[in-house]
Regions:
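Periodic glycine anchor positions in long extracellular repeat architectures
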Residues: 210, 214, 218-237, 241, ...
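C-terminal or otherwise distal, non-catalytic regulatory regions appended to signaling enzyme catalytic cores
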Residues: 227, 252-253
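Conserved GTPase G-domain substructure that encodes guanine base recognition and part of the catalytic core
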Residues: 1-12, 17-212, 238, 242, ...
Length: 253
């Protein structure tokens, strides 16, 4: 499996396989990732702004993941790796084989929360011991939906908050076109921060940088998180904006 390119308007995502498919495949995958990380855009800047590594929270063996992070990504990502690498542990709900997940409140109970926090600490420690970097992983659950059942995501707002935060300020606003307006998706989190508020704050930083279509864009940002946000967004967009140039033409990803 090669690195695949996905385009959402001017947002470009590169999806790469991990390691663990055998020595020859691992060498091939590593070379592809290294090549992409070292690629520059037309302005001589790194093509890749940030790297998101998703780990399987239900797996006990993360050896190949550590090799990917410590030996492939970190040595080749360039400057400020701690601000450009995001590690997310998925399937938090089944990390202990489904035990201690409170389905009613859609969150981990204390036993599972302690287990997940220890896994976060372990991943952080292993990376630090190998590279000297302090990268703080997070855990989340993507949720699921089928014709019989549904489970909302958990900590997805935290993941999005960090993705937006790690994206250069002048490029953040492009996310506004692709964030779901379904409030249930963003409702459940560890509540360490008000992540929805922080996401809006980060997006408005882009508006303040001059990337704006005035009240219309401000309103679109606000709509992502409810009626109050929409009103505030329109006011902020109207005050800050007024530049009626298309957002798409302002990004070159």
């Amino acid at each position: 499996m090669d690195i695949k390119k996905f385009e959402l308007d001017n947002l470009i995502l590169w999806d790469s396989p991990g390691l663990g498919d055998g020595r020859d495949k691992d060498i091939q995958h590593s070379k592809g990732i290294i090549s992409k990380l070292n690629e520059l855009d037309e302005n001589g800047k790194p093509l890749i702004d940030m790297v998101l590594v998703i780990l399987d929270g239900s797996s006990r063996d993360l050896g190949t993941s550590y090799e990917l992070i410590n030996s492939v990504i970190i040595p080749n990502i360039g400057e400020n790796p701690e601000k450009r690498i995001l590690i997310a542990i998925n399937q938090a709900d089944v990390a202990m084989k489904g035990k201690y997940w409170n389905e009613k409140e859609n969150k981990p109970e204390k036993e599972l929360e302690d287990f997940l926090n220890e896994k976060v600490a372990s991943v952080k420690r292993r990376i630090n011991e190998a590279t000297g970097l302090n990268i703080e992983p997070i855990y989340y659950s993507a949720g699921y939906k089928d014709k019989y059942d549904k489970q909302n995501p958990y900590n997805l707002s935290k993941l999005l908050y960090l993705i937006v935060k790690y994206t250069p300020v002048n490029k953040r606003l492009i996310y506004a076109n692709h964030i779901s307006s379904d409030e249930e998706i963003w409702k459940y989190s560890d509540e360490i921060k008000d992540y929805n508020r922080e996401i809006k704050k980060s997006l408005f930083e882009s508006v303040k940088e001059g990337i704006s279509e005035g009240a219309e864009i401000g309103g679109e940002i606000g709509k992502l998180f409810g009626k109050t946000g929409e009103t505030i967004g329109k006011i902020a967009g109207g005050v800050i904006g007024g530049i009626a140039s298309g957002i798409k033409s302002l990004f070159s990803w």
